[in-house]
Each structure stands twice: as structure tokens, then as C-alpha cells.
Amino acid sequence: MTNSSSLPRRILTCAFLLLAAGITAQAQTTKPVAPATWQAVLASPRATPVVGAAKGDVTIVEYFDYNCPDCRALDPKVRQLLTSDPHVTVIRKDWPVFGDVSEYAAYCTYAAAKEGKYATAHDALISSKQDLDKKEDVQSVMQAAGFDMKKIDADITQHQKQYSAIVAADEHETDVLGLKGTPGVVINGKVVSGKIDYARLVSLVADARKH
């Protein structure tokens, strides 16, 4: 027999669980953006190459920060997807919400891209076990990955105006798209909200192909 005194507590517990489930379901949504906005995102100048297929049937645009824990957690899932699905294109756009050091890290990858080593720089920074709190931390990671930081920094000094404009444009896109924080993910013109694990990422790509 159920103790009547425990009923209110159980009702409250059930209500809380239902509310939590509703919030989770609502959070895991996709929202289409205007076609012109999506085309502008795809056409905007970049300092780094696309990843995966050059012209895939599904394009994922990720706005990220090298110091963002959730971005670091998402990166291996994206890599796994690219390994299993050769028809996906990934465009990475820097959104250094964690500050100047994150922006410097982005600039380092732009300079590395000119050497044909963007993937090496990106992988080293996004998977770094040490915090990137100072420029010296970024330099240490880059040096360990085989980069000559005098050359990298010279390139950044020479092209800082160009690199800054690219980051500013990417940040403006996040406002236009209504992104709330890193990582910001857009798949074939739909803004993805909520946690993205590997299973959901695969599902989102499959859904994009249907539409």
C-alpha cells in the first residue's frame, strides 16, 4: 500500500522528470536559416581549407574555440564521422569567445595552413592536454607539433589585419545565425541546438540527406 504522505513527493518527482525530459527534447532541435544566409556562410572568405569531401552532399559548419571544452569533445566525433562517411564536408570557423589567446591560436592555424599543415596545427591545439591560457601555451603546443614559431609569428604579424577581419566576419555570422555559444553547428542550412553525441551527429547527417 502506498503511504499517502509520500504521494506529494512522488508527484513532484514525476513532474520534475517530465519537465526535464521536455527541456531536453526541446533543446535538441534544428532550425532552418534563410537560404541566402546559408549561401553567404558558405561563400565567406576563409583562411583554412575545408575538411573531408571537397564538395560533399552534406556540409557541416562548426563555429568553435580552441579553449572550449565542448568543442574539444565534439572534434573527435566529427573526425570519426569523416572517417566513416566520405561524402561530408566540414568547414571550421573560429569563434574565439574565450579571448585573445584563443584568437591567437586561430591565427596560428591560419599561418600553418599556408604551409599546408592546417590539420597538424588544428589537431594539436584542439586535442592539447594543457590549458591554452597564455600565448606561450599555444606556442609550446605548436612547437611540439613541429612548427617554427618565429615563422608562424612573422606570418601573423604580416597578415594580422586580414586574419582579424576573417574572425570578425565569422563572429558576425554567429549573430546572424542566432548561435548561443560554442560549439555552434549548422548542417545543410539548419542550426543544431543541444548536445551532439556521435549517434546524433550521424542521425543529423542522415536527416540532411533526406531534405
Where are these regions (language model features)?
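Extracytoplasmic thiol/disulfide redox context detector
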Residues: 2-5, 14-98, 161-177, 181, ...
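Short coil/turn linker and secondary-structure boundary residues
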Residues: 33-36, 116, 133, 147, ...
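C-terminal cap of thioredoxin/glutaredoxin-like
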Residues: 2-4, 28, 140-211
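Structural alpha/beta surface segment adjacent to cysteine/selenocysteine redox centers
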Residues: 61-67, 72-143, 206-211
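Generic signature of intrinsically disordered, low-complexity segments enriched in small/polar residues
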Residues: 19, 41, 67-69, 113, ...
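Short clusters of hydrophobic/aromatic residues that line enzyme substrate/ligand-binding pockets
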Residues: 50-51, 132, 192
